[in-house]
UniProtKB/Swiss-Prot annotation:
Keywords: Aminoacyl-tRNA synthetase, ATP-binding, Cytoplasm, Ligase, Nucleotide-binding, Protein biosynthesis. The gene is serS. This is Serine--tRNA ligase. Pathway: Aminoacyl-tRNA biosynthesis; selenocysteinyl-tRNA(Sec) biosynthesis; L-seryl-tRNA(Sec) from L-serine and tRNA(Sec): step 1/1. It comes from Neisseria meningitidis serogroup C (strain 053442). GO terms for molecular function: ATP binding; serine-tRNA ligase activity. The keyword Cytoplasm applies.
Amino acid sequence: MLDIQLLRSNTAAVAERLAARGYEFDAARFNALEEQRKAVQVKTEELQASRNSISKQIGALKGQGKHEEAQAAMDQVAQIKTDLEQAAADLDAVQKELDAWLLSIPNLPHESVPAGKDETENVEVRKVGTPREFDFEIKDHVDLGEPLGLDFEGGAKLSGARFTVMRGQIARLHRALAQFMLDTHTLQHGYTEHYTPYIVDDTTLQGTGQLPKFAEDLFHVTRGGDETKTTQYLIPTAEVTLTNTVADSIIPSEQLPLKLTAHSPCFRSEAGSYGKDTRGLIRQHQFDKVEMVQIVHPEKSYETLEEMVGHAENILKALELPYRVITLCTGDMGFGAAKTYDLEVWVPAQNTYREISSCSNCEDFQARRMKARFKDENGKNRLVHTLNGSGLAVGRTLVAVLENHQNADGSINIPAALQPYMGGVAKLEVK
């Protein structure tokens, strides 16, 4: 959520920065609500002053035996009390409208973010690794994976489209990838592993920015036997739960940075994705991801963003996968991000790079929604900065390993770094 004081003092500048990311800020509406709020506040202050003044007179009037005048003054105070209650209700209504609107406004792009309308104007930062040249006709991950235990038909039978069953060697490889990622982040990069709920309340999703704007992208659930029919949600990413562990808290500055990681399933309705990536694992309703989150001092957040990109890159390098890093332009960034880098892995069968990680600095946007603060060296409470990144999406990493390390006979070479997690197995072969 944006700083309301920044909006009040720099409305035009904020509107211009939001326009760069394709959001039209209604300055006239904001100014009208602000005028309404100010008018109610002025009226409230005048009523309070009048009440206090008249209340002081009542005792004096009674002492002078002026009982009728004292009663009239008491009647005035009673009316003022009613007027104050109405003013409080009016102010609350205006404030609620402002707050609800603020929750729907995206973050401001950082000054270093390239301007652009959509993904076609993202900027490549670097490429690492050279895509392999095959001397045989390659297969995609579907044709490679099905003989090894990848079962799309079984997933569809159980749950519908965009669900998958894995068994045998593929299931083991999928598990090994997640364990390798977790071990790398905890043992080499200094993150603390977490296990968090997969079902959350709306306030939790509001804290990280998925609600209220993106409700259609979420899976909604209700408890059996719950007469209130309270809606909860399956998490779209462990970013939600990891980041919210610091909601409504004040962290001593010496404890920063907090580095959190978790392996979890992610559930997404993929609203608006009809017809996209219908074949294979690239776009699923349920997929696993190892998430990285850091809670940091505001002055350290952009340094931390570069560090987190490096942590995700280390996984790709260890798995011997070609990839590139791109900076998202203003028109392609996520709702809560001030700056985002995407890591895209080479997918041979598609002859292109596909997103496998997204690392974002949200600055204080989420922290303001969550009331996540730290106590600085002067004893003042300030908002932390929050960052998140995929480290990595497990299913897409599986796709990349299958396709980049395939052999002509359909077998798959296991990268050396992954072999200890596969019980020493160096190759997947159709049995």
